[in-house]
Amino acid sequence: MFDTGGEAPPATPAATIVIFRNDPAGGPPQLLMVERSAEMRFAGGAAVFPGGRVDPADFALGERIAAETGLAPDEAAHQIAAVRETLEETGLALGLAGEIDATKAQAARAMLAHSGALAPVLEAFDWRLDLAQI
């Protein structure tokens, strides 16, 4: 252990999702990881699971959907962040429901890169959250 010389900094709310599948060829399960940009301050160049910080827009959407999902707003926000980060980093539309195909998922990913928030993407594509998937 080491002495940090004081109190630890406050934790940053974040969410990560671990995605794996059975190998279609019958081999061992496959695990999805992404490589962080080498220019990133934290863990630049590292192989990581999709995920990241819970943004204020995730907390706002979490508040809006908490009652209908039965989740606490904070828990909903963390799950929303996992869905958003997965779409943003991989193009996979996990935790979402509606008419979703690869073309729409890529368009949604591009929109998300521009807006940074999941709620406008849901509205634009007439999608809804299906957090039971995750």
Where are each of the predicted segments found?
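N-terminal leader/linker segments that precede catalytic domains of diphosphate-processing enzymes
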Residues: 1-134
